[in-house]
Amino acid sequence: MRTGRVIVSVLVVVAALVAGCSGASDDAAAPTVRGSWHGDIEVPGQPIAIGVSFAEDGSATIDIPAQGVRDAPLKDVRTEPDRVEFTIPDAPGDPGFRGKLDGDRLTGDWVQSGEKAPVTLQRGKIENLPRPQDPKPPYPYRSEDVTYRNGDIAIAGTLTEPEGSGPFPAMLLITGSGPQDRNEELMGHRPFQLLADTFTRAGYAVLRTDDRGVGGTSGTLDDATYPDLAADAAAGLAFLRTRPEIDPARVGLFGHSEGGYLAPMVAALPGSDVAFAVLMAGPSVPGADVLIEQNKVIMASTGAPQGQIDQQVAYVSEWSRLLRAGDIEGARAFTQRHNDSLPVAERAPQEVVDGFNTPYMTSFITHDPKPTLQALRVPVLAFFGDKDQQVIATQNEGPMRENLAAAPDATVHTFPGLNHLMQPTATGKPSEYATIETTIDPAVLTYVTGWLTQRVPPR
């Protein structure tokens, strides 16, 4: 289990890095150390590739491609040949490197929460993981960066359209949970860029946008509720209908994960006039239930003891109960007490704890998709991956069929061997996402495109 703890600890670092940590020492980098290095944290059975760059001003950054981390600043940087060190700021267990220059290598240990894993780095930049499905120019369609508004919120995105004058059927892509850019980029994959490319080549106009607080979109995601985000999406539909090359009667929605919660909410809004909806790994049960089952499955897959799983489920259940009861202050105090009760090395950074009880997170935990799914009266495709560990197919497929029973044309399908991103996978673990070259299984792209062209054929 100690090996498992090292793996988990390294993965936990990502939350702190993505949050935008910063800071470095003022020591000038020694010429013998300055520059780029790459190598592996030698976790048994799961080596983790990293790249570290030491700048002339004494600062340093780290890349962890397998976890989607790029150019994350480091602190406590030392670059003497016999003492090379750095630490990742604001991460549980003070993870970092302790080593020295050894000829043309940096050798030492990755240290976190009192545990160590050997590290050897050699000169040179770390290579990006291959992403063979990334669309590459020249594109056989038009691409335009666009902006529009939902009240005080400026929304930025990219609209891709087939060549010609139209009118084209169109769709808005709605991202999954957390702050996502218009490509829904994570772990080096850009699923929404691939989907937009696929559907536009098939004859559809596709709008994909940055979430609140990301890229060119204003606002802050944590301060937004689900009704706020549904209104953002509705503004996207309205924008599409202002374009003369788009058929206003054939505009639909594609939601991934949390986007599968939001798409039916948008369709239920007065005047939305959605023509179709596609839900990729979209939950059909309340958010609290999704999170509890997700914790069970992921923890079990990492070998956690049943007692530890039971404790985590009890914690999530009580926290969810407080949020559903509207006791936000009680939920905040509960999460704070829980974090304070952990050993210092295992505590989450305060900003992570604070993020558990935002309006955005509260919306997720308290949301029940049943009413809006049951209200859908347009063609709907909902599909899952049977190895998904985030939206569990066995938990969601049955309720999805029941909730869509009144829809005039509903298709519910589960793909074998695919994870939450619809990648072919051995286990479905989120830790595998970056290591898989495929962004979305081609069979999924073919299936969804076929479903669309049968129901909303391009003209």
Q: How does the language model describe each region?
A:
Residues 276-375:
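Accessory cap/linker subdomain of secreted extracellular hydrolases
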Residues 196-216:
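Conserved alpha/beta-hydrolase
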Residues 29-101, 110, 133, 140, ...:
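Central antiparallel beta-sheet cores of small beta-barrel/beta-sandwich binding domains
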Residues 126-166:
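N-terminal cap/lid segment of alpha/beta-hydrolase-fold proteins
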Residues 378, 389-403:
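Short alpha-helix in the alpha/beta-hydrolase fold that links the catalytic acid
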Residues 376, 382-384:
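Short beta-strand/loop motif that positions the catalytic acidic residue
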Residues 167-177:
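Short beta-strand element of the alpha/beta-hydrolase
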